[in-house]
Amino acid sequence: MTSILVSRFLIAALVLQYATSDAVNYCRLPCRGCDYHVGCGEPAYAQECGQSPRTRELLKEHRNEILSKINDVRDHVAKGSWGLPMAARMKVVVWDAELAGLAKRHTKGCVGETHACRNTERFWLPGQLNFKYSGDKLPRIRELIDDAVKKGHLQKHNITREFIENYRENGPNGNVKGLALAISDRVTAVGCGLTTWEDGAKARALLTCNFSSQNIRGRPVYKIGNSPGEKCIEKDETYKNLCSATEPIDPNKSN
């Protein structure tokens, strides 16, 4: 009986997620400290998109690849790898269609960092990572994803226990924003978008991923434990050091 109720709850939550995504008027959402909301108005390509801009569909295989890469890193960090402390309650990240839709709209600007809001009714302070590609030939989508992950993975040399306990974007060894966001224990979901275009003889691409939360300066990236997942209600079957996807973590509550 319990399993039936849980299944019904998850189905209802999924239906609500999609219904909310379609019904929200982003122009009316609070947008503090930003010029505009990325979800407000009709989506159109910006002048920066050069010639032949095209927003690419991220298929299930691409979405699974992104989730696998992120959860692999989270699982690795949660068990205390790279000299980092173990995570007490870091959950498996799932795909979110609304975050992906806003990420897709962001990529149509063909500029990585902007002053646009990306908050939703469910996620009040989403984080964002942008990966820009430029080359003679456009690689396959999976190769773009792999390149983006490798770039973020290099930040493991910059991040320390001190950064985990007291977050800031930069330190003596360089930027840690990307990796720190991927391993935040308040991140519960992610959604990405991809746009490609031509700029003269160059092929360019912008891959954007929106996360359900972002790290806050001076606050912990995740809560430290004496053993991996010691505070989890239930561990994930695949990622043994992470909480399951149903772990009730509030992405809007700071550590």
Swiss-Prot record:
Expression (tissue specificity): Expressed in salivary glands.
Principal subcellular localisation of the protein: secreted
Signal peptide range in chain numbering: 1-23
Domain SCP: from-to ranges: 67-211
CDD domains hit by this protein: CAP_euk
Cross-referenced Pfam families: CAP
UniProt keywords, alphabetically: Cell adhesion impairing toxin, Hemostasis impairing toxin, Platelet aggregation inhibiting toxin, Secreted, Signal, Toxin
Paired cysteines (S-S): none
UniProt-recorded Gene Ontology molecular function terms: toxin activity
Location(s), subcellular: Secreted
GO cellular component terms listed in the entry, alphabetical order: extracellular region
SMART domains: SCP
InterPro entries, per the entry: CAP_dom (IPR014044), CAP_sf (IPR035940), P14a_insect (IPR034763)
Signal recorded as keyword: yes
Purpose of the protein: Inhibits platelet aggregation induced by all agonists tested. May act by competing with fibrinogen for binding to glycoprotein IIb/IIIa (ITGA2B/ITGB3).
Assigned protein family: Belongs to the CRISP family.
Protein name in the entry: Tabinhibitin 1
Organism: Tabanus yao
